[in-house]
Amino acid sequence: MPFLPGKMPKPAVCRRPATSFHADLAGGSRYLYWKHNATPSPHPRRPRVFRVQGDTAMDWQGLRFLGESPVDGYVLQNCTYSPSLVALAFLVACLAGYTALDMVERVGNSLSHPRLWQWIGAFCLGSGIWATHFVAMLAFHAPIALRYDLPITGLSLLIAVAASYLTMYMTARPRFGLLPCLLAACCIGLGIAAMHYTGMAAMRSVATQYYQPSLFALSVLIAIGAAFTALAAVPYLRGRRSARYRYMKLIASLLLAGAIAAMHFTGMAALVLSVPAGTPLELQASADSLRLGWLTGVLASAIAACGIWAAWSEKQRERRLSENSRVNALLNQLDHAHASLRQMARYDSLTGLQNRTAFNEVFVQHLENCRLRGKGLAVMFLDLDHFKRINDSLGHDSGDQLLKIVSERIRSVLRDSDVVARFAGDEFCVLADLTQDHEAHILSQRLMQKMKEPIALDGRTLVMTASVGVSLYPNDGEQCEELLKNAGLALHQSKACGRNNAQFFSRQLLVRATQELQMEEELRQALRDDQLELHYQPILALADGEVHQLEALVRWRHPTQGLLGPDRFIGLAEANGMIDQLDDWVLRRACRDLRSLHLAGHERLRVAVNCCASNLGRASLVDEVRHALEQAGLAACFLELEVTEDALMYNIDQTIPLLERLRELGVSLSIDDFGTGYSSLAYLRRLPLDALKVDRSFIMDIPASQRDMEIAQAIIAMAQKLHLKVVAEGVETPQQLAFLRENHCELVQGYLFSRPLPLAALEEFLRAYRFDAAPPLRSLNQA
């Protein structure tokens, strides 16, 4: 068979019967051949193969695809194959298909060099297709000598690699749908066919090759169809690690190998070899072909194995990179979280100012710098006046907005070297370097003046004031803690002086603070050790002169300072959260003492107990009163609770329901120190009250003060119009008593009748009073 273009040799003509079969059994050959003579037949049968002679034949490299049956020659049939090489060829195809799918997966998932993996996959698949063809051709045994043209064989390899690359390129698309899959299947299917028939063109022998058109077309369709089925699994191989992943990949590789093998052997089934007449036919030695086939198969398998190993190594590398990236991402997140936590730990999230933690660190550095340079330093506490009222009335969002505005204003006043921090709520702290002490006074005034500028907030215009406390280094301390403490004492003094002012630390403040701290500790100890006691001041009725009621007044018998009045420790108890415990003790002790007086024969006596503002904010007050009465065995009608105007007005909407519950319990209610606080007559008529107590400040200057007399008269008249009893406090002279009697005041108390007395002295007073008939009242009645 000629391989290069040119004129084909004319087959020899044999003079034999029209048609006959011959078996050449020389050397044990089982090859059959079919002879045609040159005598034309009047009824020619339909040709089974392609015609050799004539210009109508399609001739390329000695291959005939179209034409009539060959004449005057032999057609070789029933050529055999080496089973081991056929199996090896299929194994090579499987490895090539598996490697190609592995590369497809790499191209889709690779983090780097996807084009390189396309070329590696194309070479592995193309060389595998070519090796499958070549090993299968070496497995082909024909009774003629066969050899292969090297350039054309190399061309078939290039065709296989090129088709494989185009297929790899198509499958690398992110969206590999039905149409791209069909195009890729056509590409690889046609590439396999082109490689096969180009490789067949490289085969050289005395025979002429003919192809049956139907089988030829079927081989191409089989290659495309099987490739399409295999490539349809590509989308499922990307990013999938399910239980069926490996099975799907194996099945797809078998389908791709089947496409290669099916195309090859279908193409071989379409092949018909025709030899010239008289050509000797003998079985060729197959040992060399077998060795060459195995060598080729092993090399191709090694190439595929290297591709699989490379893909596996890349997977491991990318897995390590992915793990490292994940770890690095976690570390970055941790760093970011650490930075965020550090930011949150050092800076106020609302205003962006430093918080106490960061301020303390900066304070140490500032103080050390001032110490080295010999300069002064001012520590200022700034607290907004009545900020809680803003939160309660406008809401916390408005309060937060106000704090942002205030922080910006403080920044605008300070220098770049100064430091400002937000400690808590509406409290700010400033560090300012000083050359002279009077600069601190100037700065504090500038801060206070800046705070007074109008603020537009939620459609309102607000004017805020601030209290400032200042301590100076080195005059007021040389340590951070000491300077902060002293500035806090100065701020406390500023609030005590009416707010909206600046106070500088002095040693007297420290002495007072030390005393208050000691008093606080001793008061707690007094509550635990029962060092408190109640004194009772009688309240008399002007109508009959009888003692109708007692006011319970707490006293503290201090171990070193003696008997202390409530003005010495009530404020301390309120400031340190002990007032609730103190009021509860007074209530229980007063109920118990009154019960003992009832048992002593004073059954009509009632007792009045003071109730602080914080107690009116507790819903448990009613239960505490009920428990104290039950524990003492006392009826509720004998108890009266006294509250101040300020306590009532502090939270009037919550106070009114609480007072109504106390009235339902049977407890009487009165307003203590009436006229000294702020109240509204509209609220006064809504309150469930029984009595008003005129403060002693309106009684003490009667009759010298005409204004006080008019105020007292107005209060008494108003109470009578509201059907409330009136109790006048601080009655100390007969003139005051006469004035109250003339204005129809019902009840009086004061030093004119008795000082507050302990229980034992009170019992003596009641016994003596019963028989003495109250000299002041008796003389007044006689007059």
From Swiss-Prot:
The gene is nbdA. It is a multi-pass membrane protein. Disruption phenotype: Inactivation of the gene impairs biofilm dispersion upon exposure to NO but not dispersion in response to glutamate. Disruption of the gene does not cause a biofilm-related phenotype under standard conditions. Mutants exhibit an intermediate virulence phenotype. It comes from Pseudomonas aeruginosa (strain ATCC 15692 / DSM 22644 / CIP 104116 / JCM 14847 / LMG 12228 / 1C / PRS 101 / PAO1). Its EC number is 3.1.4.52. 3',3'-c-di-GMP binds at Q537, E551, R555, N610, N615, D672, R696, E732, Y751. The lineage of its organism: Bacteria, Pseudomonadati, Pseudomonadota, Gammaproteobacteria, Pseudomonadales. Induction: Expression is induced in response to nitric oxide (NO). Is probably only weakly expressed under normal conditions. Residues 81-274 form the MHYT domain. Mg(2+) 2 binds at D672, D673, E729. Pfam families: EAL, GGDEF, MHYT. It catalyses: 3',3'-c-di-GMP + H2O = 5'-phosphoguanylyl(3'->5')guanosine + H(+). Signal peptide: none annotated. The N-terminal MHYT domain might sense NO through a bound metal ion. Residues 516-770 form the EAL domain. This is Cyclic di-GMP phosphodiesterase NbdA. CDD domains: EAL, GGDEF. One of its GO terms (biological process) is cellular response to nitric oxide. It is found in: Cell inner membrane. Mg(2+) 1 binds at E551, N610, E642, D672. Its cofactor is Mg(2+). Residues 375-507 form the GGDEF domain. Binds 2 Mg(2+) ions per subunit.
